[in-house]
Structures are given as structure tokens and as C-alpha cells.
Amino acid sequence: MGRARKPPPALHRHCEGCFNRHCHVPVEPSVSCLVISCHLLCGATFHMCKESEHTLLCPLEQVPCLNSEYGCPLSMARHKLAKHLQVCPASVVCCSMEWIRWPNVDSETFLHENIMKETPSEECLDTALALQDQKVLFRSLKMVELFPETRDATEEEPDMNGDTSWEETGGAVGGVDARLAPNSCLPATSRQMMELSQEERDALAKTKEGMDLDKFGKWESMFSKEHAASVLTGSLGKSEDKNGDVAGKEQCSSNVRIGDAEGSAERRGPQESQKSQELPATMEMTGLAPWQDGVLERLKTAVDAKDYNMYLVHNGRMLIHFGQMPACTPKERDFVYGNLEAQEVKTVYTFKIPVSYCGKRARLGDAMLKCRPSEHKAVDTSDLGISVEDLPKSDLIKTTLQCALERELKGHVISESRSIDGLFMDLATQTYNFEPEQFSSETVLADLLGTAQPGGLHVELHSECVTRRHNKSSSAFTFTCNKFFRRDEFPLHFKNVHTDIQSSLDGWFQHRCPLAYLGCTFVQNHFRPPGQKAKVIYSQELKTFAIKPEVAPELSEKWKSDHLSGRDGKSLNSLTSLPLEVLQYIAGFLDSISLSQLSQVSVLMRNICATLLQERGMVLSQWKKKRYSHGGTSWKVHNQIWQFSSLFSKINSWEFNDVTSMSEHLKTCPFNIVERKTDPIRLTSMCQPQEKARESLVSTFRARPRGRHF
């Protein structure tokens, strides 16, 4: 424990209410003190006894950054804190840009096949981004969720209450985890060690995860009554054992252990006493405290739904704290109607199933169903006379994507049972024959695709925006940027990457041949950064867009031959031979993504880039989950990681590339085959019968023959 801090001295009687800069009250030991000015020259004047208070408000006082707990090591004057937050290395923003990319089921298959036949290029932006999204998609599709019939039956679920050894599941201090041992089965010393003291319970009740102390007192009174009732029940059972009604039986509870005289440890033999020391595998647990194991299961059988819901409302936080409920359960303040009394929900069935046969039931579905002859037929492949091993295997990628797409668009799986009416139901059966017949619960599609299997592009080249009507939380086809940037870098990243490049890949920033649907892979990039010869690429290693400058061939050949030999015989280039001050000056002109790549060249360059981390880099906190022996968990900062972001240089405007027109490519495009029609073809009007003459009142009188006049 640290030393107790001395409380600040009390203000003098006059100084406590004096705010006059020109105070001339004489100095007295218990009345007033000397008037001084701030030693940092901020302009404030005050009594000497108020100097400690002024340090809390002085704008020139050196204070740590507001994000010092998140890794920022800088200290500055208090009036510079607000301006520093814009460039603080610990003020990190995560990009939440989202887009949708659907799988390619039956459209543009020729284009995708021809693209994968060519050598992958980093200048083909839409293809590189689609391949990266495909990798993310394959790592997120779990096979068991799409095909539950293929679950491995021999897989064992992790059970903390099973045969796990207590030594392997130690607590925070290396002891036995109290969650694995029944309270009634432990010795008296173990029970005393496992039970929490009153101070520990008060501390848990005051934490954010627990409830307040007032409700904790109500819980204690309720649990003390339950404890007294269990003691009374045990004493009655002991008196019955003495009368001879019950002999040779032993009752165990979480708080009281009762035995008859014949079963006591003093009268037992050495073998029986040795067996009594062993901990049984299963033992009945009682008690309704939130920290007791199995309390929710006992409540479901002991009380009705109304009392069970009220117990969850009042004791929800402690149940989460002791691991009885998952952490995603809403807290008490999240319940809008938490103060209202819960009511049991009863389902009323208005449709009554008839108990007798009704002949008109067949007319609901098909009127001729009764007249048609019926026969027994197999619904499987047994009538084909082919064994299951000889049947062709299903395409793993296409079948998985098709089933995931059906669940995404239709809201249900392909094979789903559908009820016709109150009596009949269509039981759908859809099975697939994959190469691996069974999958574990954690198997994803990417785990089944080995290096020997040829890859392909199975998603669309163009992406779509996420709308409000799309359920992106459960969608497997929604992708997120998830890149971290400093607060001053995020607007530039969003404008240059997402607004200028990614949203314009389909026809504006990048233009494909109009005959791409036939399989033509020709593509043009229309824009480049202004003032320099560079091109936009997509780096698969960094998983982001970048600007790559174009180096002249004569400069690249000169760089290969321009090497110096060091004292130890190692080859050194001309850049390494420069002084450290010059190297640091040159590195100051590079963008963040260039600094991150330069730091991986050598140890010297890494040390040069490390000097720019506080000015250009960012710090991220690496969190680690810590589990305690009493069942509670908390997240602690495990490490601080310094790195550069993936932001490239700021681009305010773009310039057109010097590329030829697309019409020039169409002249030599191998898919632009002119089809000349030489045979005469009837027009549409010639294929129909000629229309009748238009009938009118005038034509009617003209067609009437003229009679004789008398």
C-alpha cells in the first residue's frame, strides 16, 4: 500500500474569499498570507495558499495528453491540449466504409475465367480488390451453418464441468478454479477459501459490472433466509436419522453437510475414510445466489415464468459478472419497461386440429388427389443402382456460395420445411456429396481449399453500396474497410480511396472493354496523380490502394550498378552512405505508407523511421482478456503498438492519362467479330397478315349499291 497523502492545508480566513489582485491586507499567520504571481507568468495573481489550486487551472502548466492512458507520451501546456488532439498519435479512427459484393453464379463466367488465366497485375484494380474480398468471404463462411447435416458427430464440445483437470484450469493466482468444484463436495478449508468475504462482496457490488449496495443488502437478506431454511431442513433430517427412519444415507448441500452416526468419519474404516476424501464427479447443488452454479436451471423448475423474469431483471448484472449468463445480455438500464411487473406470455391456438377423419380435407390441396392411383417410390438415388462413392462430388465453392446467397436473398436455406396447412407439412431434403464428408464446427470454406486446388474468381468485379434495407449484421457478403488512421489522416483516406477510386472503378476511374461480357480482359486506367508520373495500384500485401511512381529505365539500371562495398565486404547503396541527419530529412517528405515500407528495408532505415513515429505514426492498444478464479473477466491493455498507417500522399485533383481511345482497341479486339448477314430476312411487318381496310361511315355508304329511282 502507498503512503497516505497529506490533505492540502486549509485556506486562511481572509484568503478563502479574497479575489482582489491588489489586496494589501497585512500578513497574519491565521488570517491572510502573501499575494504572489504565477511562476509560469500566465498573468494570474493570488494568495500563496491558493497556489496548489491554481496549478489545476493554469493554462501554462505542463500536463500529459488526454490520451496518455491510450499510449500518447507527450506533455504540453494546458491551453494546447485541444489543438493537439487533431494530431495526437493515440487519437485513432477506424474506417467503417462498407460495401456489398455478390457471388458470381452464372453471369460473366467467360470474363472471370480469362482473367484468372492471365498473370495477376496490381494495376487491375477491380480484380485485385475482388480477390481480396473473396479471401475474406471464404474465411467467414462456416460449413456447419450452411450444411448442418455434415457436422462431425464425434466432435466433443468444450465442457468446463466435465473431466477437465483442476490443475490445468487454474485461476488468476494458479490455484484451483472454483467453478469446477461443487461447493458441498469441498472440505471445510476449501469452502472458506472459495467463499467471498463481506468486503469482497461489497467491492463487487460497487463495481460497474455489479449492482448498487442497496439492492445487495436486499439480496443478502433473501439469501440468509434461504440459508436458514436449509439449516432447518437439515436439522429435521438429522432428527429423523436418530429415530431410525432413515439409516445409512447422507445429505449434501452447498452450505450444510449432514450425516448419521454410523456414517461418521470416526467410525469408518481406513478404506471408507479414504473414499470419502475423494471429490465426487456430480453432486446436487442448491441455493438461489447469483454466484452459485446452476442457479438458472433450478429457478426454471422451482418458480414460474413471472418470478423467473423478475429475477433476471434484478440480478442480471451479478449473473453476468459470475459467468451465469452471456455478456451480451442487456443491462438493467437498457430495459425500457424494467420497473413494470413481468407477465407470463401465453400462446393461444385458435386453430383446433380435428380428431376425426373429414373427407373434405383432400379438396383443400388437390380435388383429383383421391382419384389418382398411388404407389411407393424411393426419393433417394438407390433406384439408380449406383453406389454413393461413384456419384460425382459437388463443387465445394459453387455449392457453398449458392446456399449462402439463397439464405442472404430469400431469408432461408435452399432446403427448408414448409407447412401446407394445419395438418400437412412438406419435409424438404437436400443433401450434397462433398469430398470431405464431415466438418467440424470451426471449419470454414478457406480451410478446405488447398494449394493444389486451382483458384478462381467466384465473386462479381463490381461492388454495391450498403443500403438501409440490407441486414448487414448477419450478411456474409458485406465487407468493411477496417483500416486505422490518425484523426487528421482519415478525411484524406476516405476522399482519395473510397470516394475517388473505389466508387469509380466501374467505368469511370477504370474502363473495361465493352465486349468484356464475351471474355475480353482489356482494361484502361484513365486517371493519375497530378504533377508526377505515377500510377494507382492495389497491394495484396498491404490490402489497400497505393501510389507507385514510374521510374525511368535508365535510372533503374544505374541504381543496380551503383553499389558501394563496406568494410565488412557487404554491399551498400549510395542512400545508406548518407549521414543520419540527411536521411532523417529525406524521410520527412515521405507519406505514411512509404514510411511503413521503408522501415522494413534495414535496421538503419527502421531506426530512421522510428524518430518520426510520434509526429507521423499512431499508437494502438493491444487488449487481452484476463479471467479470474471467481469467474469474472476483464480486459487489460497488454501492449502498445506503434506503426504507420496506409495513407498515401494527398491528391486534390486527378489528371487524365495519355491512353488511346477505346475505339482503337475495338479495331483489334479478338472478340469484336463482325457478323455479316447475306441472306434476306423478312421484316416484322411482312411476317404478319395485311391489315384490313379501315372501316368508316363514309366507306360504308360508298360500298352500298345504288338503287333505281322512280
Swiss-Prot record:
Q: In which tissues is it expressed?
A: Expressed only in heart and skeletal muscle.
Where are the zinc-finger regions (TRAF-type) in this chain?
A: 53-114
InterPro entries from the entry?
F-box-like_dom_sf, F-box_dom, Fbxo30/Fbxo40, Znf_RING/FYVE/PHD, Znf_TRAF, Znf_TRAF_N
Among Gene3D superfamilies, the record links this protein to: TRAF-like zinc-finger, N-terminal subdomain, Zinc/RING finger domain, C3HC4 (zinc finger)
Compartments it resides in: Cytoplasm
Residues crossing the lipid bilayer are: none
Domain of life from the UniProt record: Eukaryota
Region spans: Disordered = 152-174, 234-279
State one molecular function term (GO): ubiquitin protein ligase activity
Cite a single GO BP annotation. Answer: muscle cell differentiation
Task: Give UniProt keywords alphabetically.
Answer: Cytoplasm, Metal-binding, Ubl conjugation pathway, Zinc, Zinc-finger
Segments forming domain F-box:
572-626
Which ranges are annotated Basic and acidic residues under compositional bias?
238-248
A GO cellular component entry from the record: cytoplasm
What SUPFAM superfamilies has UniProt attached to this entry? F-box domain (SSF81383), TRAF domain-like (SSF49599)
Assembly: Directly interacts with SKP1 and CUL1.
What is the recorded function of this protein according to its Swiss-Prot or TrEMBL entry?
Probable substrate-recognition component of the SCF (SKP1-CUL1-F-box protein)-type E3 ubiquitin ligase complex that may function in myogenesis.
Its name, as the record gives it, is: F-box only protein 40
